Amino acid sequence: MQDLSLEARLAELESRLAFQESTIEELNVTVTAHEMEMAKLRDHLRLLTEKLKASQPSNIASQAEETPPPHY
């Protein structure tokens, strides 16, 4: 009787392990897909930031363009 319960417990553990391995593999695929998507989004964000900076002139004048303060 003891052997049967040990065999049943072992079978249950093996079944759980198989499901866990399957779940881990699915999660790995999902995480990998998310990492790839995030890399694409980072690239798009970088490009959009560069375009935005290029299209907007800076409101801050360079030191050569600045007029000296009135007390000079």
From Swiss-Prot:
| Polar residues biased stretches | 55-65
InterPro entries linked: SlyX (IPR007236)
Signal peptide positions (record):
none
Region Disordered, residue ranges: 52-72
Q: Which Pfam families match?
A: SlyX
Family named by the database record: Belongs to the SlyX family.
Which HAMAP family does this UniProt record tie to the protein? SlyX
The protein here is known as Protein SlyX
